[in-house]
């Protein structure tokens, strides 16, 4: 008896492209899950300082 075929790529690219090969979605704010706790803590304070500076700049601009 003849040996059976182990693998073929026939039709695989056609199947893949029927719905289009899409890039994974990237989001504006990626999750911080799994990020170092020390970094996340400092990041929180840094964001707060940035928000205060922006608020002050807006107040000075409008005044």
UniProtKB/Swiss-Prot annotation:
Residues 1-26 have a biased composition (Basic residues). This is Large ribosomal subunit protein eL29. GO terms for cellular component: cytosolic large ribosomal subunit. Component of the ribosome, a large ribonucleoprotein complex responsible for the synthesis of proteins in the cell. The small ribosomal subunit (SSU) binds messenger RNAs (mRNAs) and translates the encoded message by selecting cognate aminoacyl-transfer RNA (tRNA) molecules. The large subunit (LSU) contains the ribosomal catalytic site termed the peptidyl transferase center (PTC), which catalyzes the formation of peptide bonds, thereby polymerizing the amino acids delivered by tRNAs into a polypeptide chain. It is found in: Cytoplasm. Its main location: cytoplasm. GO terms for molecular function: structural constituent of ribosome. Component of the large ribosomal subunit. Mature ribosomes consist of a small (40S) and a large (60S) subunit. The 40S subunit contains about 32 different proteins and 1 molecule of RNA (18S). The 60S subunit contains 45 different proteins and 3 molecules of RNA (25S, 5.8S and 5S). One of its GO terms (biological process) is cytoplasmic translation. Residues 1-35 are annotated as: Disordered. It comes from Candida albicans (strain SC5314 / ATCC MYA-2876) (Yeast). InterPro entries: Ribosomal_eL29. Belongs to the eukaryotic ribosomal protein eL29 family. Keywords: Cytoplasm, Ribonucleoprotein, Ribosomal protein. It comes from the Eukaryota. The gene is RPL29.
């Amino acid at each position: 008896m003849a040996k059976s075929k182990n693998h073929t790529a026939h039709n695989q690219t056609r199947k893949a492209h029927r719905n289009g090969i899409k890039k994974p979605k990237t989001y504006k704010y990626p999750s911080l899950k799994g990020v170092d706790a020390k970094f996340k803590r400092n990041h929180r304070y840094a964001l707060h300082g940035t928000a205060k500076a922006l608020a002050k700049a807006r107040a000075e601009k409008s005044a």
